Amino acid sequence: MENTENYLECERNRVYYTLIAIAGFFGAYTFLLRGKVFCNAQTGNLVLLGLAIGQAEWETAAYYLFPISAYMAGAFISELLPNPVKYHLKIRWDTLLIAVEMATVLVLGLVPESAPVQISQVAVNFIASMQYNTFRQAEGTPMATTFATNHIHVS
């Protein structure tokens, strides 16, 4: 058994389990309540995009480009921000990201049902991508907090 005292707080198992729950919430929220799009990961959206293209449903295919693009943007931004954040704000990127996720959940809770679903989809895709890209291991175990199949594999 490894000594867990040498890990950063963001690498603790309790953080990992919390992030898994958040990603599950994001996926259920956007699929069940916000347009039947998976926003915690993109495999489902890529499959649905491929099906739409295969059936020549161009409008539906274009619809799936929104979440996929937002996810890609989140990954890009999460690669660019850590060093400038640490340098200018004197705070770790992972700590700031947790605060941003909390604020995002709060704001999404205030978005009325009548609002376009793309608002929630883009926000969740963006934040889930940054979560996946930022939190990569828990106590020495590689992790992907937004993919359920990874949790089964790691268990």
Q: What are these language model-derived features?
A:
Residues M1-R12:
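Short, Lys/Arg-rich, polar N-terminal cytosolic tail immediately upstream
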Residues V15, L19-A23, F66, A70-G74, ...:
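Alpha-helical transmembrane segments in multi-pass membrane proteins
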Residues A23-F38:
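Alpha-helical transmembrane segments of multi-pass membrane proteins
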Residues Q42-W58:
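Perimembrane loop-to-helix junctions flanking transmembrane segments
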Residues G44-V47, P67, V124-S155:
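Substrate-agnostic recognition of the 12-TM MFS/MFS-like secondary transporter fold
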Residues F76-K90:
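Helix-to-loop junctions at the C-terminal end of transmembrane segments
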Residues K90-A99, Q121-A123, A144, A148:
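Cytoplasmic-side transmembrane-helix entry/capping segments in multi-pass membrane proteins
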Residues A99-V117:
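C-terminal ends and interior cores of transmembrane alpha-helices
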